[in-house]
Amino acid sequence: PATMTLPVEELESILKTAAEYKKECENINQIETKNDKKRADFVGINMEGPFISPIKKGAQDERNIIPCNEEIAQRFLDASDHLVKFLGIAPEESANAVSFIKNMKDKVNISLAHTNASYETAKEALEAGANHIVHLFNAMTGFTHREPGVVGAASDNEHTMSEIICDGVHIHPSMIRAAFKMMSAERMIFISDSMRATGMPDGQYTLGGLDVKVTGNR
């Protein structure tokens, strides 16, 4: 699962609960058989905030966005008992982004997420040790012939993995095909990026404290 951009204390509480649930699942695994299992394995957490860009916040609450902070990031890792596997940042929003990446990269995978970074800034972040792109094309700089942005930097860095949403709504199928040609299937990760209203009737729902209206498949 992925966390939203929420107050730091609330995120810590969520991460502690997730760690407790993980331990409970491990205890259950010891007594149930493979045929009894009716749930997915909880393998880790993807944090899409709060170190993101207010310009590319998408459905995140701007009030809770903060610059990269190693102390706070360590609190997240500790609260989750290191269940956090991906930590998203917008490198252009923090003067210390490169040092943050270098100091944290051996503890957690650093993603570029909800970012308005230029090609040069994204390239620098990836060379510093970031290795993952959150939902390619969505909530990031555009990909054009003069300003290739985050997509161009990800394409150029062969050590970078990129998520992509293949629901036919977030990205045009032509761009999905183009991404696979640029980066190869081995570097692409299919994600749903779905919320709890997925599969529910049209209506009003909430996402990270924000009101969301569902109409059809949007």
Regions found by a protein language model. Give the residues of each.
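Ser/Thr-centric signal marking residues that sit
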Residues: 1-5, 115, 192
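Histidine/acidic-residue-rich, glycine-tolerant segments that coordinate divalent metal ions
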Residues: 6-148, 199
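Conserved strand-turn element in the central/C-terminal portion of the radical SAM core barrel
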Residues: 2-8, 89, 162-167
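Active-site-adjacent C-terminal substructures of enzyme catalytic domains
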Residues: 121-218
